[in-house]
Structure formats: C-alpha cells, structure tokens
C-alpha cells in the first residue's frame, strides 16, 4: 500500500512536470520566431514586440484571479481549460496576419497559461503531503530551464527545416497530446491516491496532522517576502534579458556567439533549485534566512563584476547570480505557498507571488534599458548590486518573525 502511494505520487509529479514543461514550448516559440517573422517584411520589430508584450501583460494580470479560482473550483478543470486555450492559440496563430489579431490571440494565450501553475500547485498539495509534496514542487521548478532549452532547440529545427509557422504548429500538436494525457491520466491517479489515503486515514488518524495556526501577513513578515519576491524578479530577469547585449558591448563578440554562451545559463540555473531545497530543509530551515544568503552571495558576485572581469569571469558571475535567483524563486514562488495549506489559499498565494515576480520582470525590462542608455554598464552593474542588497535586507528583517510563524512543510502536511 505504501509503495502504491509512492508510485501514484511519482506519476502525479511526472504528469504535472510534462504539463508545465510543455507550456514553455507554446510561449517561447514566439520569441524564437521573431527574427524569421521580421525578415518576411510583413511586420516590424515594434509591432511584433507589442504582440510579445500582450502575452506578458495578460499572463501577469491573470495570475491573481486564476490563483483565486484555483482555490474555488476544481484545479483539474482549470488546468484543462488553460491547456486547451494555449493549444488553440498556438494552432491558430500562423493563420493570423494582422498585428491586432496576433495581439488578441497571444493575449488569450497569456491568460490560458496563467491558469496552469497555481492550480497545479494546489493539486499537488491536495493529493500528497509532507516531503512528497516538497519533492514534487521542487521537481516542477526544473521545468523552466528545461522548457527554455527544449523550446529553443525545437524552434531552431523548425526554422531551419521549414519556417516560423511550424514553430507554432509543432508546439500546438505537442500541447494537444498533453491535453489528452492530462484528461486521461489525472482521473486515474486521483482514484489510486484516494484508495491509498483512505486506509491510512482510518488506521493512523494521528499521522497526518495539519497545523491549524493561521498566518498573519503583517505579523509573520510575509509582506517583506513579497517585496523580496518583487526584487528577485527585477534582478533575475534584469540579468537574463540583458546578458547577450552586455557580452556584445563589453567584450565585442558577435551576437550569435553571445546567444550561444548565454544558453549555458539555464543549464547552470538547475543547481539553484537543488540548493534552495537542500539549504531550506537541512541548513537554514527558514525561507527568509535561505533567501538572505542567496541574495548576499549575489551581491558579492556583482561587486566583483564591478571591478572589471574578463569574459569567463563575467559569465561565472552571471551563472552564480542567476542560479541564486532561481533558488529564491523556488523558495518564494514554489515553497512559500505550501505554508498556506491550512488557510486553503495555496493557489491564491501562488498566483499572487507569481504575479509579483512578473511585475518585477516587467520593471526590469524598462528600468535597466533606461539605466544602460543614461549611465552605461557601470551604472547598471551598480543598480544590480543595489537590488541584491535591498533583497537581502527584505529577507533578513522578517527572519525571526517568520521562524516563529512558519509551518514545517516537510512533516506537518
């Protein structure tokens, strides 16, 4: 019976991983296709940029409403709607020629994809508990870098073999298969887990105890963590967005080489997920304390960059800092919502934290572009350093309060 429960939890984690990994194929294909689309002469960079902006605007705005919905209706149904929506958007996109039509379709794609992460987290928390839940959530954190690499690899093949339209059709066909997987596999997994849980609950009623203590946003220090979440979004995407341009202008390398070098970053970032999981459970046992350490390491690395490093040295700094921010993302966007299980607000908390992260990302896109033009890369490096310091203090301030109010997500649930 115990092995059956583990197998069912593993199957749940695998299906959820495939789902969230797959939506990157139907998101990043537009970015990968922009160069080929501009070469047709039908659309300009500004017009296509507005289409990309429509997606991120919709994705960010829909996070909180979709998070709340995930706590109100069936997470399984909400994910299904989101998957069907993003599948349709990708399959239809190549048939649309007008910029307005593209904006509308990609805006709807953003809303559809916003329906997936909060309810997926909610479903994992509902069907598993303790270390099982944490393991699956940490495993899902690997989908971002893995999905990014897979998306660019698939799109590179499609662009070389055919044209930009096939980037969307290939993603749409894959997503359609994922819809079928979700519809078939999840009901089976739910039934198996329910069969395992009922005997355990009847024979060992005291084993799964839930901490009923409610978390106060002000008294627990969660508000400080919300600010830290925003800052990590600014710093993480502020770096990843500008790394290729930084390398080109600082070291006068070709744009193609800068992109190839930059592709190493997502692979290295996988280590950030592991460090967050290990550090939080074994070393620091407090999300704010772990986050403060990660921000602190980032500050030291950026300060070293400001002294004038070589190309390899700069790449090491970028790799370390973005890995640290991947770790912070794991702490605050993946693990922190698990503390709100007792309140029944896991999906809502996930949506809010994800929205704040994307607000930080949007801020970074504008802020660092302006800073680079006005103050050069030296001024931008200084701004990165200030962001790291601010994030570190936002984590340090609530350490004691959060230590008192936090729940042991590894054993209590």
Task: Label each region the model flagged.
Residues 72-82, 281-295:
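Cytoplasmic membrane-interface "Motif A"-like loop-to-helix N-cap segments
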Residues 61-99:
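Conserved MFS/SLC helix-loop-helix module at the cytosolic interface between two early adjacent transmembrane helices
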């Amino acid at each position: 019976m115990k092995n059956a429960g583990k197998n069912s939890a593993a199957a749940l984690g695998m299906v959820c991983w495939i789902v969230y990994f797959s939506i990157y194929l139907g998101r990043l294909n537009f970015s990968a296709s922009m160069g080929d689309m501009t070469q047709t002469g039908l659309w300009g960079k500004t017009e296509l940029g507005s289409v990309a902006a429509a997606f991120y605007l919709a994705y960010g705005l829909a996070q909180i409403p979709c998070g709340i919905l995930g706590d109100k209706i069936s997470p399984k149904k909400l994910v299904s709607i989101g998957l069907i929506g993003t599948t349709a958007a990708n399959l239809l996109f190549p048939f649309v020629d007008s910029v307005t039509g593209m904006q509308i379709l990609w805006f709807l794609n953003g809303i559809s994809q916003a329906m997936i992460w909060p309810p997926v987290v909610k479903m994992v928390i509902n069907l598993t508990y303790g270390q099982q839940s944490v393991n699956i959530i940490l495993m899902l954190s690997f989908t971002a870098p893995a999905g990014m690499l897979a998306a660019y690899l698939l799109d590179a093949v499609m662009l070389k073999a055919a044209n930009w339209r096939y980037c969307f059709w290939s993603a749409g066909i894959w997503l359609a298969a994922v819809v079928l997987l979700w519809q078939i596999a999840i009901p089976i997994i739910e039934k198996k887990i329910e069969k395992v849980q009922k005997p355990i609950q009847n024979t060992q009623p005291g084993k799964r105890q839930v901490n009923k203590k409610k978390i106060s946003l002000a008294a627990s220090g969660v508000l400080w963590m919300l600010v830290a979440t925003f800052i990590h979004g600014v710093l993480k995407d502020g770096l990843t967005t500008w790394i290729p341009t930084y390398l080109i202008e600082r070291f006068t390398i070709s744009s193609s080489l800068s992109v190839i070098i930059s592709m190493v970053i997502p692979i290295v970032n996988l280590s950030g997920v592991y460090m967050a999981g290990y550090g939080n459970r074994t070393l620091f046992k407090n999300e704010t304390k772990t986050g403060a350490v990660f921000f602190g390491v980032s500050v030291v690395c950026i300060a070293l960059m400001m002294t004038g490093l070589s190309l390899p040295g700069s790449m090491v700094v970028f790799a370390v800092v973005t890995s640290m921010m991947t770790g912070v993302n794991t702490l605050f966007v993946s693990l922190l919502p698990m503390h709100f299980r007792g309140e029944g607000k896991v999906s809502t908390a996930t949506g809010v934290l994800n929205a704040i992260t994307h607000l930080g990302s949007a801020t970074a896109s504008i802020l660092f572009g302006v800073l680079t033009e006005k103050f050069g890369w030296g001024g931008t490096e200084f701004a990165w350093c200030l962001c790291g310091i601010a994030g570190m203090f936002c984590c340090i301030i609530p350490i004691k309060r959060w230590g008192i109010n936090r729940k042991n997500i590894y054993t209590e649930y």
